[in-house]
């Protein structure tokens, strides 16, 4: 399976004319999870932000994926935040994340 960034890849240019890329991932089947996890890690490694949607993943597996992504993001010097229930945003070290009042929704 080859990954096609064309449908899930965005350029963001709003603040200070700085651009960064965002990869949006939403695995629908359990068989896709390992593939999407590797794609998200590769994207972070090359300084792309990742939005990962856990909506169709059962809690125990979603928690393991979240732990893996959070650990890898931390190791690469990046940051993460929960946008809403089951939707997380991971950014590389080149992007500074600012969340209002540090209010983070619970995972589930």
Curated annotation (Swiss-Prot):
Any one GO CC term of the record: cyanelle
InterPro entries assigned to the protein according to its UniProt record, in alphabetical order: Cell_div_SepF, Cell_div_SepF/SepF-rel, SepF-like_sf
Localization: Plastid, Cyanelle
UniProt-listed Pfam families: SepF
GO biological process: cell division
Main location: plastid
Annotated keywords: Cell cycle, Cell division, Cyanelle, Plastid, Septation
Signal peptide positions (record): none
Keyword Protein biosynthesis carried by entry: no
Domain of life: Eukaryota
Family listed: Belongs to the SepF family.
PANTHER family, per database record: CELL DIVISION PROTEIN SEPF
Known role: May act as a cell division protein.
Name this protein carries in UniProt: Cell division protein sepF homolog
């Amino acid at each position: 399976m080859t990954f096609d960034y064309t449908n899930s890849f965005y350029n963001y240019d709003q603040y200070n004319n700085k651009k960064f890329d965002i990869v949006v991932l939403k695995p629908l089947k359990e068989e896709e999870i390992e593939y999407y996890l590797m794609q998200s890690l590769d994207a972070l490694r090359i300084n792309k932000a990742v939005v990962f949607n856990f909506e169709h993943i059962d809690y125990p597996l979603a928690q393991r994926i979240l732990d893996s992504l959070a650990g890898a993001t931390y190791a690469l010097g990046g940051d993460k935040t929960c946008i809403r229930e089951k939707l997380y945003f991971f950014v590389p070290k080149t992007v500074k994340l600012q969340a209002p009042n540090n209010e983070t929704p619970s995972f589930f």
